[in-house]
Structure formats: C-alpha cells, structure tokens
From Swiss-Prot:
The keyword Nucleus applies. It comes from Capsicum annuum. According to the redox status, the Cys-126-Cys-164 disulfide bridge may have a role in regulating protein function by affecting its ability to bind capped mRNA. Changing residue 213 to H: In allele pvr2(11), haplotype H1. This is Eukaryotic translation initiation factor 4E-1. GO terms for molecular function: RNA 7-methylguanosine cap binding; RNA binding; translation initiation factor activity. Residues 1-19 have a biased composition (Basic and acidic residues). Belongs to the eukaryotic initiation factor 4E family. The lineage of its organism: Eukaryota, Viridiplantae, Streptophyta, Embryophyta, Tracheophyta. MRNA binds at residues 71-76, 103, 121-122, 171-176, 216-220. Changing residue 219 to N: In strain: SC81, allele pvr2(5). In allele pvr2(18), haplotype J1. Changing residue 67 to E: In strain: Yolo Y and CDP06433; alleles pvr1-1 and pvr2(1). In strain: HD-C69; PI201234 and Perennial; allele pvr2(3). In strain: Florida VR2; Dempsey; CDP06188 and Chay Angolano; alleles pvr1-2 and pvr2(2).
Length: 228
C-alpha cells in the first residue's frame, strides 16, 4: 500500500464525529429522552467498518519505561505491550494517541514490531539478525519515525520479509531510530533495506548495520558490518 494512500485514509475517529454531528442536528429533545441513531448515521458507520484497509501483517507497539528500567535487573523486563493493530485506520488511531519521540522522556524506547515478535535479541526471529541505525538531533526524529513506520507497515521494502520492526530511542544528546532485520548474514538483503530506508527518509548521512551477535559480545565496541 502506497504511503500517500495511507496518509489520506479516513481514521475511525471521524466516524464518531459524524455520529455526534448527526445527533446534534436532530430536533431538541426532552431531558432524559433517548435519541435513536438515524438511518443515515447507521449506514455511514457500517460503511466505515466495512471499508477498513487491512495491512499485510499485524503490528504491535511496545514501550520501554525508563523509570522501570532503572529498577529492573533483567534487560527487557520493563517492556510493555501497548497496542496491536492490523488495519490502516487502527494504525492512525494508535499513532495519534501515542506520544511522538520529541515528547517522550529521556531514556524511553518506543518500538513497533510485527505481531508476536518481541523487540529483544533473544527473540527467535531476531536472534540471527541485526540493526540499521540513524541518529537525529534532539527533538528532530518525529517525521523520520513516522516515515519509518509507514514504510514498514505499508510493505515498501523489497525485502519486506526481512523486517522485524523498528525502535526510536530518546537519549540526552538526541534520538536514534533502529531498524531491526532477521538475517544479518544476508548482505544483499540488508544493504538493499539500508539504501531504501535512507531513500524513504531522504537521509543524507551514512548509516551502519551491526549484527546482534557483535552487539551482545562487544557492546559499544561493536563495529558496522555494512555501511550505506
């Protein structure tokens, strides 16, 4: 599904607005009287439900609470499942009600992964993968985060099956967006994903790809295996 189409799609919130407007247009009623929905309102709402646009996959938003992280011994134990969506309309409903990166507190991580894939190195789907990573000045990642989400859920990558999900990490000096993939050793697929991601975001700086295995062994000393 093209990004432009997704941006133009009516959200489910608008159906509720139509319902409210229809009721307001009715003649004035006595206090306590029940106002029945008109046929037009019911028909509109039915059409809205029937015309939702399904996505290729279901996706889940996860949130890693920085306060909880400081109190937990095990990495990932502070991860919380926020919301799972499977249609364009439900994505916008969730996105519009979740803080954008610039509004998150320092230390927070917001993830969006294919449903049933947890944003952890230990997840079986992620175990042999790696990450592409982009850096942004403080408060400047909102648009790139949205475009990353649209590219993922809109099936825009040629090697879409390689995509696990993405995470935006808010830190004191700025924000980072990481794109997680399945098979780090598949250089052709990873390089293609990295190049397309830069193109979707119109990102001019170089971006690097780190294997999860390297990150686990070497931590901050892990080096990029691929660069685009």
């Amino acid at each position: 599904m093209a990004t432009a189409e997704m941006e133009k799609t009516t959200t489910f919130d608008e159906a509720e607005k139509v319902k409210l407007n229809a009721n307001e247009a009715d003649d004035e009623v006595e206090e306590g009287e029940i106002v029945e929905e008109t046929d037009d309102t019911t028909s509109y709402l039915s059409k809205e439900i029937a015309t939702k646009h399904p996505l290729e996959h279901s996706w889940t938003f996860w949130f890693d609470n920085p306060v909880a992280k400081s109190k937990q011994a095990a990495w990932g134990s502070s991860l919380r499942n926020v919301y799972t969506f499977s249609t364009v309309e439900d994505f916008w409903g969730a996105y519009n009600n979740i803080h954008h990166p610039s509004k998150l507190v320092v230390g927070a991580d917001l993830h969006c992964f294919k449903h049933k894939i947890e944003p952890k190195w230990e997840d079986p789907v992620c175990a042999n993968g790696g990450t592409w990573k982009m850096s942004f000045s403080k408060g400047k990642s909102d648009t790139s985060w949205l475009y990353t989400l649209l590219a993922m859920i809109g099936h825009q990558f040629d090697h879409e099956d390689e995509i696990c999900g993405a995470v935006v990490s808010v830190r004191g000096k700025g924000e980072k967006i990481s794109l997680w993939t399945k098979n780090a050793a598949n250089e052709t697929a990873q390089v293609s994903i990295g190049k397309q991601w830069k193109q979707f975001l119109d990102y001019s700086d170089s971006v690097g790809f780190i294997f999860h295995d390297d990150a686990k062994r070497l931590d901050r000393n892990a080096k990029n295996r691929y660069t685009v």
